[in-house]
Amino acid sequence: MKVKVKTKAVAYLRTSSATNGDGDSQVRQRAAIAAFSKTAGFELVDEFADVAVSGADPIESREGFAHLLDRIEGNGVRIVIIEDASRLARQLVTQELAILALIARGVRVLTANGDDLTDDSDPSRVMMRQIAGCVYRKIKPARSDGEVRPRWRAN
């Protein structure tokens, strides 16, 4: 019988405030990442987090992201899993710099819903990722105030 070896991956979490670090945000992110990893056949071997870090903060100023890069360069893990693109960044430039830094190291960035943020084989995918990166920071504050809701949610 052949034993299937799981591909190793690391998780990256980001919370925008210290209270989110202790609260639901990290729990929710971990659960989504763990569920996706199990379903997709990845073995999570480490976790990196930036707590109380704005999604607009530059990648190079994030301690958790720096540790993630060190780990990648040191052990050959080539998959980073995040809950969604907003956990990486909420500014387009920050998002794209993070993705390019990981692509340069031969790393794929996957979201917990299976999107490959590093897949640049289809220009339309790249365009949609970049549009989402521009739009999310405008939508999120409005959604927090209850002004904008997805059509499928009544309240």
Where are the model-predicted features located?
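Short, structured surface patches at the beginning of a domain
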Residues: M1-P150
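Charged, gly/pro-enriched flexible loop segments at helix/strand junctions
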Residues: R153-N155
